[in-house]
């Protein structure tokens, strides 16, 4: 008996002694498989789902827009992506174990129909391969089983072959355009494999033994080596067997490519995944679109969806997924990849559906449940399904205690528990309970101070609290700890945009979207930067009807058009105001055209404009206004002009114009509270000097996922040096009022939302010589966030007020547009 005889006893009956003598090759293949499988968990970093970008960004945009009202600036949030400490993996980054079927002992090496082909190594982009098994029978190359689970009986589980149009498979799809990178990768590596296959000795010369060895290599985790060896004698294999080996090799490259994307930052990170995409698309062209091949083609497309999503070709991935969903069964891991693509493309309803179906259909170990649940959580928030998101969190919490159950060592922490606590804190922040959510994040940051996911979540909370400076400082500090974490890098860029530091944001974003096209945080930064750098159109229009104190009928349209920024600090703008009023049987029009230059830098904005008025008192003039935001809490602004648009129409009719100077100081505690003080003085050409002082205080008193209620208190006083004029000019007056503001957002979809607001105002007005009288006003407003670039708001209202002792009922409406072009 030779030393190799015991080995031959464990071989299948059909193996010859010649094939049995090659056990050194088997040992080498097994060793290589163990090395690959063992090192994958060490190099694979986790990633949160990029759908959180949209969820946080929507709330940050609305808060900063209301608070800052700075015109062209656009604000956005960040989220965590691959590369951080303790960061959960993207739902597509599955850690799976693939098994395949082996040809029967009497399999012929002659060409035969594809329907009789054996199943090859799992084409699913898994990161592990199953241990060698003595020819298990698997219903398809994409069946996923956890280690040690026996393969099911194919005779008992094989589904009936579909008939009709569904049997045609995805082959009826129009071919996707192969990217130049993928074509080049396929040409460069057509005869090779990446990573290179280690030499393991000569192959058998016997035809049957050679055939069996290649199929065993394909089955036991060496599919690319099997493909390489098959090319030596392609005529020794059935055409269908070649297809299955090619499929298994392409799937293995997808697995390698997905790992390469995580650990390499240079342009070479796409080499393997591009090769895999090219091979998958070439294989689809080889396999005939026939009913007997429909199931196999469905499996190929399932892996193609994963590869395309990993490469950042999200639209192509969605196109393939939607087509294959109509023709047959879709694996759970493919639905996860499709969910990632939908989330990336800001279609959260479809992302939620894909994630939910993946969780429902997945076999044990097929997908990373926690990551998919996190993606579903953010997709629910992005579609306004807050109650369902809360229920999902409760389920996750029930399934994941703080410590691992039945762990070898008592008290072993459960890594998914910290994820759930972070999501609970983010849920509080994104549904209005910002302080409570931030307190929870600060608590967990104390427990894990270097976790990039917690740093990004906390910085997001600062943005929601209208604290962009603090958010940027957090990201800047985190960069020293996580210089390669894209969520931190992109977050720093977006926070820089929030304080008008365009140069820094551009430097951060430079080249990121080309190097990481699949990354959601990088894409969010690019979208914010594109909006910030685009031209912008802002239109504010009003019309009202009242008594004759100011005008019987009046309307005005104020239009500003800004160019895109140039030299990182400048914009050109054009300004037009057109208005008309009717009173006492007469009418008066006013038009003013101007052009100017805006200069901005971190926390500073200055606008200088030269303008020309036409009409009865037309003149050439200029306006200078400036805003300084030295911190997250203080904002100081001022304006000076020698052609004041606030001069009443009745005064303008008789040739009166005015010069004015005004200033405002505002202190903001957070998104729920602020106070402001305004002073203005105007000198009219009829020698009337008008002064005004106003103070306001706002406090939010109630918040829920869809509703907020706040109260705005105001008091002001004014005085004029001249009275008895043809326009309203009281010697002294005072007013105090309180406005209740109810805001309701019944619809939300990614960047889009609809908000309805009701304003109810009541107060007292006192005019010297005329006494005190009540004043009331009611207003209804709708705000449409049409997309990331466009906001439309409009409203109607009614007010009652006394002027010179005479009551005036005023009806008004308005329309505002903010459209980056």
Locate predicted features.
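Gram-negative and organellar
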Residues: 135, 161-164, 172-821
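Compositionally biased, proline/threonine/alanine/serine-rich low-complexity intrinsically disordered stretches
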Residues: 47-203
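Gram-negative bacterial Sec-dependent N-terminal signal peptides
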Residues: 1-47
């Amino acid at each position: 008996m030779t030393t190799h005889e015991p080995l031959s006893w464990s071989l299948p009956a059909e193996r010859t002694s010649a094939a049995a003598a090659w056990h050194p090759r088997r040992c080498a293949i097994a060793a290589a498989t163990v090395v690959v499988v063992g090192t994958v968990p060490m190099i694979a970093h986790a990633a949160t789902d990029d759908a959180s970008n949209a969820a946080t960004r929507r709330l940050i945009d609305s808060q900063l827009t209301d608070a800052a009202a700075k015109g062209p600036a656009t604000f956005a949030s960040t989220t965590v992506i691959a590369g951080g400490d303790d960061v959960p993996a993207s739902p597509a980054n599955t850690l799976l174990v693939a098994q395949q079927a082996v040809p029967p002992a009497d399999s012929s090496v002659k060409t035969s129909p594809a329907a009789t082909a054996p199943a090859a190594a799992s084409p699913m982009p898994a990161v592990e391969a199953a241990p060698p098994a003595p020819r298990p029978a698997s219903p398809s190359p994409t069946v996923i089983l956890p280690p040690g689970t026996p393969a099911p009986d194919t005779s008992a589980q094989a589904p009936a072959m579909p008939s009709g149009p569904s049997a045609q498979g995805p082959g009826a799809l129009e071919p996707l355009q192969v990217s130049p990178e993928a074509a080049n990768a396929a040409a460069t590596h057509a005869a090779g494999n990446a990573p290179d296959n280690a030499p393991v000795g000569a192959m058998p010369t016997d035809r049957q033994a050679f055939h069996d060895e290649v199929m065993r290599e394909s089955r036991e985790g060496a599919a690319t080596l099997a493909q390489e060896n098959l090319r030596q004698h392609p005529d020794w294999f059935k055409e269908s067997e070649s297809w299955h080996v090619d499929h298994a090799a392409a799937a293995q490259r997808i697995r390698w490519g997905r790992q390469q994307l995580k650990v390499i930052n240079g342009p070479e990170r796409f080499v393997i995944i591009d090769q895999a995409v090219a091979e998958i698309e070439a294989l689809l062209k080889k396999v005939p679109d026939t009913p007997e091949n429909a199931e196999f083609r469905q499996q190929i497309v399932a892996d193609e969806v994963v590869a395309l999503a990993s490469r950042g070709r999200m639209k192509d991935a969605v196109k393939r997924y939607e087509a294959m969903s109509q023709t047959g069964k879709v694996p759970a891991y493919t639905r996860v990849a499709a969910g990632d693509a939908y989330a990336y493309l800001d279609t959260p309803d479809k992302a939620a559906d894909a994630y939910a179906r993946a969780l429902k259909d997945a076999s044990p170990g097929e997908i990373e449940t926690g990551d998919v649940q996190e993606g579903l959580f953010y997709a629910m928030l992005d579609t306004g399904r807050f109650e369902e998101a809360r229920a999902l969190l409760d389920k996750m919490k029930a399934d994941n205690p703080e410590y691992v159950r039945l762990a070898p060592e008592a008290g072993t922490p459960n890594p998914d528990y910290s994820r759930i606590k972070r999501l609970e804190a983010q849920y509080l922040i994104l549904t209005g309970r910002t302080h409570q959510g931030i307190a929870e994040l600060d608590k967990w940051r104390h427990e894990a101070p270097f976790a990039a996911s917690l740093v990004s979540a906390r910085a997001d909370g600062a943005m929601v609290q209208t604290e962009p400076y603090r958010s940027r400082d957090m990201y800047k500090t985190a960069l020293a700890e996580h210089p390669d974490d894209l969520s931190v890098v992109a977050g720093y860029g977006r926070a820089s945009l929030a304080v008008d530091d365009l140069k820094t944001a551009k430097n951060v974003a430079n080249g990121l979207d080309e190097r990481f096209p699949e990354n959601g945080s990088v894409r969010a930064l690019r979208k914010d930067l594109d909006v910030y750098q685009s031209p912008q159109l802002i239109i504010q229009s009003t019309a009202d009807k009242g008594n004759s104190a100011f005008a019987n009928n009046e309307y005005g349209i104020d239009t500003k058009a800004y160019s895109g920024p140039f030299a990182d600090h400048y914009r050109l703008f054009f300004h037009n105001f057109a208005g008309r009023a009717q009173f006492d049987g007469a009418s008066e029009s006013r038009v003013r055209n101007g052009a100017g230059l805006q200069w901005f830098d971190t926390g500073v904005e200055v606008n200088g404009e030269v303008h020309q008025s036409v009409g009865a008192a037309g003149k050439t003039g200029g306006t200078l206004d400036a805003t300084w935001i030295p911190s997250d809490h203080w904002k100081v602004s001022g304006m000076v002009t020698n052609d004041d648009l606030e001069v009443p129409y009745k005064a303008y009719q008789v040739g009166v114009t005015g010069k004015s100077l005004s200033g405002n100081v505002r202190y903001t505690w957070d998104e729920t509270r602020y106070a402001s003080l305004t002073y203005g003085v105007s000198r009219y050409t009829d020698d009337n000097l008008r002064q005004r002082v106003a103070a306001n205080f706002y406090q939010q008193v109630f918040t829920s996922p869809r509703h907020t209620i706040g109260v705005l208190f105001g008091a002001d006083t004014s005085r004029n040096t001249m009275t008895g004029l043809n326009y309203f000019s009281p010697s002294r007056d005072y007013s105090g009022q309180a406005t209740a503001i109810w805001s309701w957002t019944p619809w939300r979809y990614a960047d889009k939302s609809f908000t309805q607001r009701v304003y109810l105002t009541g107060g007292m007005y006192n005019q010297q010589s005329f006494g005190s009288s009540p004043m009331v006003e009611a207003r209804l407003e709708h705000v449409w966030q049409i997309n990331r670039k466009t906001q439309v708001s409009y409203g109607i209202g009614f007010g009652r007020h006394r002027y010179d002792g005479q009551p005036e009922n005023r009806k008004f409406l308005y329309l505002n547009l903010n459209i980056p072009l």
